[in-house]
Every structure is written in structure tokens, then in C-alpha cells.
Amino acid sequence: MKRFALLLITILVLAALIAPNAMAEKQYKIAFLPKIIGNTFFEVAGAHAVDMGKQLGVEVTYDGPAVASVAEQVKFINTFVNQGYDAIVVSALDPNGLNQALKRAMSKGVVIVTWDSDVDPHYRTFYVNQGTPDILGRVLVDMVATQLPDPQQKIKVAFHYSSPTVTDQNSWAKFAEKIVASEYKNWEILTWQYSEMDFPKAVSVGEQLLKTYPDVNAIICPDSTAFPGQAKAIENLNMGGKVIVVGFTTPSTISQYIKRGTVVKGALWDCGVQGAAGVYTAYKLLKGEEIKVGSSFAIPGIQGEFKVVPNRMQGGDMYEKSDLSDAKDNGIILLPERLIFTKDNIDQYKF
């Protein structure tokens, strides 16, 4: 009997020692889903997302559609859910097109975080955001204004980006339009053009824009594919120095156009930091750590504080009229800084 009791005690002690370690060794699986693969912006973000996973001891899979397709993104979400992923970090091609797939994922306990481009807040927890529309719309307009002898002079402006439905780019472009209407009343907006994140199409659309509107003075491209595509179109038509073109893309993508003088200024944020932050946010939530609107947090190895702000800061009905507009456990996580690239600093950036 004594031997049995000793054996039982030994088993219980071993179980007590093993159980915490077993729990600690739980390895989460996080899917990192871009709008499209093969694009430098998303490849850099994906690489840093995977690296952050390694730092955290988390399995991170970077994969997504080869073409910019909402239907393809839905397929990837469903596949990740069926494969047992614990979290999905997604850059959405459409604010509503992924809702049902994300709803299904959340019903199965999958943590949803968005990055770069958001969905309806009801279908995610937090949005890792490069900057609210007022911040990024201002960056776009300022890059044009600072290249003019007189910012209040009469000019003709065009917008060229990926799609009329993509959440992020439209919010920045629409806020830029508001700034133009209120602060630069002599700027006339001629047209809005879209090239669906396809570089050859961006060049073609860019050339057609220049031919259709030969008097255009500035083209604003809040899209990492349209911006270099428009710059290439300007070079193809030998219009370098005649048209201001600004926008968002990686420094490695726009560098050649800046060095040739076709582009004077471009901008972005560190998309690698954004990718890493998306995975880190999902990891915190999986571990049960609270993220509260109004707070801020640091990420090891990344400079600056990540502020957590209310959904309403993003602007628009989807945010301002939502019952989650001022939620405390559902909101927007802002990157610490934005970057402006010129010929003087372009070589400092390695992404």
C-alpha cells in the first residue's frame, strides 16, 4: 500500500511539473495574408512577419493570391481556417468582401487582425494601420504642394491607384480631395484612374491618362504599383520634369525614378515593421494579453510606441457610425512614423 501511495505521489508530482511546460510549449500558427504576392511591399512585410514569428516561437505562414482577387482571398481564409490556424493577419482587398469568411473564422475561435487595408471592425479585432486618412491624405497633398513655386497657383491634378473599392487607398485619396477642396481651391481634379495592382496595366493606364489629359500638372498615386507604373509611363512619353508624380511605394521600387529625376518625392511607412506588428498583435491576443484603446505598447526590436486609437479615427460611416466606433477592445494600432524619400536619403532605406 505504501509503495502504491508513493507511486501515486510521484505521478502527481511529475504531472504537476510537466503540465505547465506542455502549456508553455503550445506553438501557435498564424497566417499572414497579403492582397497579392510578388509585390515588393507585401513581400517585405511578409518576410518581417515570418521573422517576428521566429522571434516569438510562432509558426507564421506567408501566402496569398497571385492576382488581386477578393474571391481568392476568401479561398485562402477558408483554407487557413480548415488547416487549424490560430490567427489570420490580413490586408483586405475590399472592406466587405471578406466579411462572411472572417465571420466563420471568428466563430471557430480564430483571431483576426487586419493590416494595411481594413474590413468592417465587426470582423476583426484590431487594425495595424500605417496612418489614419488625415495623416496620409496630408502627406500626399504636401508632397505636391512643396514642389510648386506657389502652392496656391492653378494646377490640374489626377488620382491613379488600384481600385475604387479598396479601403485604405480610397480613404487616403478622399481625404486628400477634402484638403484640396478646402486649402487649395485653385487645384482642379481632372480624373480618377485605377489599375488593379497590375504593373503593366499601371503603365498603360498611366500613359493613357497623360495622353487624355495632356495639361495635367500633378498625379497622386496612393498605391505601391500605380506609383512606379505612372512614373514609368511619364518616362515612356518623355515627360520627365513636366508632370509632378507622388505616391506611396517602397524605396527600392521608386529609387530608380527618383535618381533619374522623374520623381522628386515618394513616401511610405516601414512595411516590414507593419508586417512584424501584425504578427505581434495577433500573438498578444492569442496569449490572452489585453490591448486597450487609449493605451500604447512597444514591440521588441522596433523603435517607437504603437498607439491604440478608436475606430472612429479612421473616418467614414463604416467607422464613425458603427457601434464599435469607440470600443475599448477593438480599434486601430498606429505605426510610429511615416517616411518621405528623396534623392538625398533614398539609399538609406533597405526595403
Predicted ranges, named:
Residues 11-12:
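Repetitive helical segments and hydrophobic/amphipathic motifs
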